[in-house]
């Protein structure tokens, strides 16, 4: 049975009144109309603005569960938590672990991908820089071994879509080329790479920056490192830049500047969410490392008298980021592009990221502050 939704809709970068027909889980038609035009009989009025649902490239968990728990039920719960909050498509992200734990995690997440709960797997580590390890266990960081890499890719059965790495490590450039040739997106992150090393990695096939600015050397005018190199690569070489635009990882001014320089087609808003997303303050863990969430910011736990620990993932959802950035002055079409069509295009999800005929019927309804009020996934309202 066809359902017709009528109301404001974000289509091709503009909000217009439209009727969106949904049939068997897909968008059957999108028809712009005048507000004064008579409604199709039986159509449902939508209270808010319809927009394509969000695609999160970088998510570790939420709702008290995490993909790093190495438990199938917990992983499914984390995925559904983000679906219900507007990210109906996502990569399930793992962190640095032992080889055995990574293999187990990849196998569990590959099953979830087979079931359609997630759209792939992101390995964040273990081939990262110790000096920029952030919330990764430095004892488990290592140079890439292609035999180990291939074991993980085989365990993923084609579902490993992104790998974050520090290209300056011994064998890092070889890993970039190997991932590219294996159909996996090499992402530069947790790195001390120089400007030249980033350029070399981009030339070898790296096409993504993992949470730009975070876990990278600050931009210095005499010794430019990864940050300006990746910004330049976004403008000239088609690299996509992840931004955790939640106000804790980056200032809103920084986000707006990157959007102005690179444009929304080269920026992907990501949550980097951990199990604490949607839960609140308190103690948690990530990849076996203890952390505490206070005031909505997660940090590694330190001993008495020790300095404050590194930020350890996010506690927001992509929907929260979109609302925040719209309130900070970024236009809704730009914010929505960075949350939906840009990451969908990177992942090759041709039926996501836009309200158009033939797309999977994944949409969000937004209020006047760009907050998500309803979510549809594959033609089904998730609040029904």
Language-model-detected regions and their locations in the chain:
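His/Asp/Glu-enriched, well-ordered alpha-helical/loop segment
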Residues: 228-241, 259-271, 276-357, 363-366
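Active-site gating loops and adjacent loop-to-helix segments of metal-dependent hydrolytic enzymes
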Residues: 57-60, 80-91, 130-157, 200-216, ...
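Divalent metal-dependent hydrolysis catalytic cores, especially in the metallo-beta-lactamase
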Residues: 60-62, 76-105, 117-129, 157-170, ...
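Conserved, mostly hydrophobic/aromatic
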Residues: 58, 123, 179, 209, ...
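Generic structural signal for well-ordered alpha-helices
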Residues: 79, 103-110, 149-150, 176, ...
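N-terminal metal-binding scaffold of metallo-dependent hydrolase/deaminase domains
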Residues: 1-38
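Active-site core of metal-dependent hydrolases
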Residues: 154-281, 304
């Amino acid at each position: 049975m066809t359902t017709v939704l009528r109301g404001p809709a974000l289509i091709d970068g503009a909000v217009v009144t439209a009727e969106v027909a949904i049939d068997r889980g897909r968008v059957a038609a999108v028809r712009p109309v005048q507000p004064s035009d008579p409604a199709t009989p039986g159509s449902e009025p939508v209270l808010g603005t319809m927009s394509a649902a969000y695609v999160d490239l970088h998510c570790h968990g939420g709702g008290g569960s995490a993909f790093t728990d190495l438990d199938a039920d917990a992983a499914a719960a984390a995925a559904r938590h983000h679906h219900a909050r507007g990210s109906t498509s996502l990569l399930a992200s793992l962190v640095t672990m032992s080889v055995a734990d990574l293999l187990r995690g990849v196998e569990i997440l590959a099953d979830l991908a087979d079931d359609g709960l997630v759209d792939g797997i992101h390995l964040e580590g273990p081939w990262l820089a110790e000096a920029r390890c952030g919330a990764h266990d430095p004892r488990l960081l290592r140079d890439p071994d292609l035999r180990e890499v291939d074991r993980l890719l085989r365990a993923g059965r084609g579902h490993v879509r992104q790998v974050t790495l520090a290209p300056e490590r011994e064998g890092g450039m070889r890993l970039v080329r190997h991932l590219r040739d294996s159909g996996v997106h090499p992402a530069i992150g947790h790195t001390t790479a120089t400007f030249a090393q980033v350029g070399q990695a981009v030339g070898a096939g790296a096409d993504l920056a993992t949470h730009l600015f975070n876990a990278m050397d600050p931009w210095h005018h005499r010794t430019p490192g990864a940050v300006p190199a990746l910004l330049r690569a976004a403008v000239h070489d088609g690299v996509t830049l992840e931004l955790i635009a939640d106000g804790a990882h980056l200032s809103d001014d920084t986000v707006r500047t990157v959007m102005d320089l690179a444009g929304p087609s080269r920026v992907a808003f990501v949550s980097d969410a951990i199990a604490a997303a949607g839960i609140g303050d308190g103690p948690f863990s990530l990849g076996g490392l203890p952390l505490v969430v206070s005031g909505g910011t997660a940090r590694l736990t330190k001993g008495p008298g020790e300095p404050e620990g590194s930020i350890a993932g996010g506690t927001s959802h992509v929907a929260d980021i979109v609302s925040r950035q719209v309130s900070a002055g970024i236009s809704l079409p730009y914010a929505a592009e960075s949350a939906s069509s840009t990451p969908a295009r990177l992942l090759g999800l041709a039926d996501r990221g836009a309200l158009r005929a033939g797309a999977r019927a994944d949409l969000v309804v937004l209020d006047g502050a760009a907050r998500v009020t309803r979510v549809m996934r594959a033609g089904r309202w998730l609040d029904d």
